[in-house]
Amino acid sequence: MTRLRIRRHRDFMTPLLRVVSVVAFSLAVGAQDFEPKPDATVFAKFNAKKAPTTQGLLLRKDDRLAIIGDSITEQKMYSRILETYLTACLPELKVTVRQYGWGGETAEGFKNRMVNDALRFKPTIATTCYGMNDHKYRPYDAANGQWYRENQLAIVKGFKAAGARFVLGSPGCVGPKVPWSNAGSEAMNLNLCELRNIDIDIAQQEQVAFADVFWPMLTLGWKATNQFGENYAIAGKDAVHPGWAGQVVMATAFLQALGVDGDLGTFTVDLGTGKASATGGHEVVAFTNGELTLKSGRYPFCAPAGELSDDNSIRSGMALTDFNSRFNRLRLVVKNAPAKEYKVTWGPGTKTFSGKELAEGILLPARFAKTPFDDAFKRLDEAVGTKQNYETKQIKSLFHGEEGRADMEATVALTEKARAPLAAAIREALVPVTHTVKIEAVN
């Protein structure tokens, strides 16, 4: 195992985010260094190289993030999760996002529009997710792998030359039967695994971050079908385009590659002294008689209701990926709680916890299905969705339509005027939330 270190300029951000001047990528080397496999014969032929890991936050304040990919990106699901998360859960970064999904696209296709569509807006950081169309829904062959490698490498080099940081995402996996392919799913997934391994080679060569979409999706999809039945489709009902659960797996891969820590703050209450404190973008307004009132500029990630057995449920994907413990750690700690049990009311919900549990700390988003942030989070998320929908129209229909062919620069200027209020609506939707946590001893 070797470590390659990339020097970064010093950034001044909150201690919560642990922003450092050096971002290190732990890069696995050696042909024998592979990801562990589940103990099942279906994985026997797979040799997934050990994925590099990002250490330290790759994002910087005021970053301009480009999220790039094919029709899976154009679904505007994982891209929406990412933008909403970065806006709501890491508000101090003030990251802005553009979504560039294009159905049917390969890495070569984006390479050819990279300058006109993306680099003109001077992104400071970018993520890509290609390989699904590049693998051509057939078994792997070396010539196609080399074609993929050359185009992926050209994209990485193009963004690096423009001064942008980069996250190279692997393709995902396919499900049991792709309707438009006669190749078996095993052959296609072995092909996609090879393209994933090529992406790792490029990430190591170019010293950029890597987002492993393929291996978690393949292994967690297998786990989910064992738990919920064969109808659970991590790769989507058409075996290619994931529903919300699979999209959460994708978003999780990119959050990990971006070096997101997931600590969203802690509320600490001392019942013995009657004092309370809060960290991470939360302010104590009052604490009396066991009732803590807070004002929060940082939101937890709030998912709509959904069954864990539903592959089109965000909550299902969050459970599969341990999302709450990894990226949604908003905690309540109660000290000097002598009673055996306590009722905790947060927003519309009330739960009972032991004094020991409260002393150790509880993860609020994991324990409360409904939160005081839900309505504000939904408004913000809807604003993100509206903007991303327009970005698809802006690029596909206008930049590459009659308007763009007639006068590209005028089209850019006019569409940017239309996009500006949609981007502003996201910022306006992010408002502080005042909420209470009530702690009562159970007699």
Predicted features, each with a name:
Residues 1-15:
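N-terminal secretory signal peptides that target proteins for export/translocation
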Residues 62-77, 103-106:
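Catalytic nucleophile-elbow at a beta strand-turn-alpha helix junction centered on a G-D-S/GDSL motif
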Residues 16-28:
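Bacterial N-terminal signal peptides
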Residues 32-61:
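N-terminal pre-domain segments of enzymes
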Residues 5-7, 29, 35:
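Short linear motifs centered on Gly/Pro in flexible linkers and helix caps
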Residues 7, 54, 58-59, 80-96, ...:
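Alpha-helical cap/lid subdomain in secreted, periplasmic
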